[in-house]
C-alpha cells in the first residue's frame, strides 16, 4: 500500500471513530431531569434482580485484559456476586447495623473482606446497588450526574463527590436498558488509571 492510500485509509478510520464518539449526545437540563425521574420511577418497582455478568478489567500494569464471568443476584439490600470463571468464589454484601459488610465465600468457607479489596468491592457494590434502586442518580451527595443519549439508549455519567469514592473512581458510566429500569453495562474508571467494564446479560427482574 502506497503512502497516499495509507493516508486516506487513516483519515477514513479517524472520521469513522470520530463520528461514533460524537453519537454520544449530552442531554439538556430539562431532558436530564425527566430522564432521572423516569429511571427512578422504573427502578423503584424492581425488588430483585438475577443475571449473568462478564467483567473485563484493563490494568495499566498488565498488557492483557483480565476477563471474569459469573452470576449476580440482588434482593432488598443484599447482593451476591458469584464468580464462576476463571476462579470460583462469591462476594456477598449484607447490611448489618446500618452498614454494608462484604464477605468472601470460597471452598465452603466464609470470611469478612477487609483491606483494599474489601473497600474496592464495597465501592462497586454501592454503585451497582445504587443504580438498581435509583439512589445513585438522585443522591447528589455521592455523585455529580450527567445524562447522555446514544440512539435510543440512556447513559448516566457519575462523577464521585465523596472522598472515599474519589480515591477509588474518577468516573462511572451506567448504560440503561430500553425500559430504563435496569443497568445493562457499567464502566468504571479507577483513580489509578485501571478500567473495569461489567456487562449484564440474561437479566430477570422480580422473578
Where are the predicted features?
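An N-terminal domain-cap segment
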Residues: 48-72
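Sec-dependent signal peptide recognition
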Residues: 4-10
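Hydrophobic h-region of N-terminal signal peptides that target proteins for export
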Residues: 11-20
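Gly/Pro-enriched, hydrophobic low-complexity segments
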Residues: 21, 136-207
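Flexible, processing/modification-adjacent segments and terminal tails
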Residues: 23-28, 35, 40-45, 57, ...
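An acidic-aromatic
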Residues: 69-126, 196
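Extracytoplasmic
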Residues: 46-48, 67-69, 76, 86-88, ...
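A mature extracytoplasmic/lumenal domain signature
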Residues: 55, 83-87, 95-97, 106-108, ...
Amino acid at each position: 500500500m502506497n503512502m497516499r492510500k495509507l493516508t486516506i485509509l487513516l483519515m477514513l478510520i479517524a472520521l469513522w471513530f470520530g463520528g461514533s464518539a460524537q453519537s454520544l449526545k449530552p442531554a439538556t437540563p430539562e431532558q436530564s431531569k425527566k430522564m432521572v425521574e423516569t429511571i427512578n420511577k422504573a427502578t423503584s418497582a424492581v425488588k430483585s434482580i438475577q443475571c449473568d455478568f462478564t467483567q473485563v478489567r484493563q490494568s495499566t500494569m498488565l498488557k492483557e485484559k483480565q476477563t471474569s464471568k459469573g452470576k449476580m443476584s440482588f434482593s432488598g439490600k443484599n447482593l451476591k456476586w458469584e464468580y464462576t470463571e476463571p476462579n470460583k468464589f462469591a462476594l456477598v454484601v449484607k447490611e448489618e447495623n446500618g452498614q454494608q459488610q462484604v464477605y468472601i465465600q470460597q471452598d465452603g468457607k466464609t470470611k469478612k473482606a477487609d483491606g483494599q479489596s474489601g473497600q474496592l468491592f464495597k465501592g462497586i457494590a454501592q454503585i451497582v446497588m445504587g443504580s438498581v434502586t435509583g439512589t445513585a442518580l438522585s443522591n447528589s451527595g455521592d455523585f455529580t450526574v450527567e445524562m447522555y443519549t446514544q440512539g435510543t439508549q440512556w447513559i448516566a455519567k457519575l462523577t464521585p463527590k465523596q472522598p472515599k469514592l474519589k480515591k477509588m473512581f474518577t468516573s462511572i458510566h451506567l448504560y440503561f436498558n430500553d425500559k430504563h429500569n435496569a443497568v445493562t453495562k457499567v464502566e468504571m474508571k479507577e483513580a489509578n488509571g485501571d478500567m473495569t467494564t461489567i456487562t449484564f446479560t440474561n437479566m430477570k427482574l422480580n422473578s
